[in-house]
């Protein structure tokens, strides 16, 4: 009963939760705990937030045995809201604005809009199936046959 089990239980509970799930990354979401945020109908990020399964410092320590290369690791990991949105990993970016009041208004408006879209789902089973399929698409890849350049 450790961190791995806690993350797995969180993933399991979210995938079965019979209510809309919206995750918002507000700062730095990193390591295995951040993975649990991915099992949501919508994953959103504040414009300056970071989201990854490993911290840049941890990545640099593992890959290059040099934690001082964390800026290089961050670039390599593509952990910004803009990067993740372009990859289809998150559904939206919330602009932070210039004041906390503006940020709160932007978050409230975004949540209202996202909940309205989710409320338009025909039934809970459809929403759960879409949530499951969305989570299963994360990390989908193709292997390219180098000789023929055809997908294998």
Where are these regions (language model features)?
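Conserved catalytic cores of soluble enzyme domains
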Residues: 1-112, 116, 120
């Amino acid at each position: 009963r450790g961190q791995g089990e806690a993350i797995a239980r969180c993933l399991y509970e979210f995938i079965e939760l019979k209510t809309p799930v919206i995750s918002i990354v507000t700062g730095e979401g990193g390591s295995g705990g951040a993975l649990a945020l991915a099992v949501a109908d919508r994953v959103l990020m504040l414009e300056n937030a970071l989201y990854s399964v490993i911290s840049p410092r941890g990545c640099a320590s593992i890959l290059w045995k040099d934690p001082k290369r964390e800026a290089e690791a961050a670039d390599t990991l593509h952990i910004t809201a803009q990067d993740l949105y372009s990859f289809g990993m998150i559904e939206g970016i919330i602009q932070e604005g210039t004041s906390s009041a503006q940020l709160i208004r932007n978050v409230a408006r975004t949540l209202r809009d996202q909940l309205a879209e989710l409320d338009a789902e025909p039934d809970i089973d459809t929403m759960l199936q879409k949530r499951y399929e969305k989570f299963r698409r994360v990390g989908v890849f193709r292997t390219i046959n180098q000789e023929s350049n055809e997908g294998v």
